[in-house]
Amino acid sequence: MVLTVLWVLLLTSLVLWLAYQRASLAKATLVLGVLLVYYSWFGGGPLWWKATLWALYLPHVLLNIRPLRRFLISNRFFRIYKRMLPPMSRTEREALEAGTVWWDGELFTGGPDWNKLLSAKAPKLTAEEQAFIDGPCEELCRMIDDWDITHRRADLPPEVFDFIKKKGFWAMIIPKKYGGLEFSAYAHSCVVVKIASRSGTVASTVVVPNSLGPAELLLHYGTEEQKNHLLPRLARGEEIPCFGLTGPRVGSDASALPDTGVVCRGIYQGREVTGIRLNFSKRYITLAPIATLIGLAFRLYDPDKLMGGEQTDHGITVALVPRHTPGVTVGRRHFPLNGPFQNGPVHGKDVFVPLDAIVGGPKLAGQGWRMLVEQLSVGRCISLPSIATGGSKGAVYSTGAYARIRRQFNMPVGKFEGVEAVIARMAARTYIMDAARSVTTGAIDGGEKPSVPAGILKYHTTEMGRMIANDAMDVQGGKGIMLGPKNYLGRGYQMVPVSITVEGANILTRSLIIFGQGAVRCHPWVLKEMNAAQDPDRQRALRDFDDALFHHIGFTISNAVRSLIGAVTLSRIVRAPMSGPTKRYYEHINRFSASFAFATDVAMLSLGGYLKKKENLSARLGDVLSAMYLASMVLKHYENQGRPEVDLPLVEYACRSLLYQAQEQLHSFLRNFPVRWLAAIMRAIIFPRGLTYSAPSDRLNPRIAELVMNPGEARERLCHYVYRTLEPKNHLGLVEQAMRLAIAAEPIEKRIRVEGVKTGLVTALDLPGQIREAQAAGIISEAEAVQLREYDRRVMDIINVDDFDPRELVAGSTYEIQLDGG
């Protein structure tokens, strides 16, 4: 009996080991067969027990006979799968197939290949790119007066617009042969981060021509004639671009786009040509009020078949329309939350343009949606994440300094535990954002077009940016609330919802896009199964489906085993690519990767097309994927920066908070999974020991707060590219100066309290009075008194807020300008 039990344990262990190692069906069958033969000859146990084992084993032998397997099993599953497969529109298919699969694909495997991520080169600026950031970018930041822009003008000054155009800020993605800067994605991102730390309005103005728009589309799809004519003009700022997709009825839903273009004959520049008569209504279009070249998405029809062929509905098409084309109405402005970057509606009635206005010419008619989704991912990885990161870096930079200089109860407010917790949270989230931005743009420079990470970055960086803005307001209080020239938080806080809403609203991105696109695009077998199901050649389709199906089954079993073993052992036997203080985070990501992949497969198998409608389940699985992706970016960023030990509290807080979120979202997914018996099985495999992963410990809060509230390499790395130059209008530079003065003054203040206040020699309640009395009592020297007065003056300059004559605040008032004029 004992021997039989030992053999059962050995057999079970071998099965688990083969599943964990992802042995092929043939290899697993062979190994188990050899063991069974040995057991049958030499093992103990009754004959019926051995017969049972062979009865369980022989079907696996038959599964290796592919024609038989296809006939008996795959054929039936194939028919069921085709019925379950949800209908997919052309726009959905093009969106799913857009871009490339990168690290996101590894996280779907249940056993990510860390070498793929860790071997990638750390992104670096070239000498030319660094010179641009230190030169023109620095100068642009110095020119910016955000209060003047947002309150007085509701626009950028002409000299700022001219500088942006002349220095090539709108030409960062345009190759040098067309007169552009041809910057890397990483450099492009760093430029935006720096500008965003100074002004969200100016950053929004800079990013649009470098994101999805005429220049990007021309580079990839334009004809040579279009490129040679338009790209140099765009690079020099002679043409100002905008792109119109969003409309009042359907938002950005291209499948329901009501804007139309009808192919017909018409007069263009004095000649009768075949062209397109456009009717459209767009809104929320950045740069539209001043744009000279309007990129336009519309549905193209050819009822008279003037383009040749039998097709009358060509689908979504993109064309470039000059501003002054008859029928175009443009110039009015929207006013997005006191962030007065140029944004407004574009309308067109019976606008006639030649067929050559189509990007890429007539041969690319109907390819507009493919163009947009293929190029959207790059812009979504750069523009909004960089703006959010720049704003967050500025908020952390100022909040750390402000919390050091603002005192309550004779101590800096940043020393209170509650404030420490908020500052630590802000800093860790900023570290996550910067890591994701840096590593992902590096991947783009390596040739990737990561469509799923684009959604992850867009959603999570803007959401973290919103949280950081709220936290900065909480810590700085009235300083952030009272608007005026001295307020460096208010306008950025007001503009936060803009980034939440644009380029795919965050609710939509979380509930539909991240997991919905990733489950098909990144899964190693789902897309292959879908393609097989839609293959008109039935024999080939069944053969491909059979191969994908059985790989998928083995994949699911392996991930179930990996998830169970990882959970039981607390990830301790999971292989990690690194030793040292970050090793455990790699192990936990591997464990959650297996759990996520297993849960994904069970959900898709049991719910089928219904999963598409269960948006909350999809959102939670997307959160798990996002948490693993962002934690991976944190670890890679830490490696890229040389593994500085002083940054470990930030890394620990970031990874722990992300992996805790992954655990909690998996838990929430299981609680709400509609097939309850399957949920119970999944819970037993994913959480056999319960919820064992903890959120960041409170002990990290003071360590991180100290890093942020003191000058040092960790603070400098975290807030790299923040515009901090010490000049009268840059309050981030001024608050940094005040912080340094406060730190230098602390020993002197302490001496006054100990030797003066406590002994009764100093009785004044305010610092200026205490300085006078302490100097008179000989507690401090004259030089120390001068030092303290300078420190107090600088601190009060920061702490003080603006007040106004009531007439200055009346809408449209010129009172302030009259005062300035004398």
Give the role of each language-model region.
Residues 271-329:
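A short core secondary-structure module
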Residues 343, 351-352, 358-371, 475-493:
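Flexible glycine/proline-rich, aromatic-decorated loop/lid segments
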Residues 347-380, 397-414, 559-583, 592-612:
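A glycine-rich, basic-preceded beta-loop-alpha segment at the flavin cofactor/substrate interface
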Residues 418-445, 470-473, 626-637:
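Loop-to-helix element that buttresses phosphate recognition and phosphoryl-transfer chemistry
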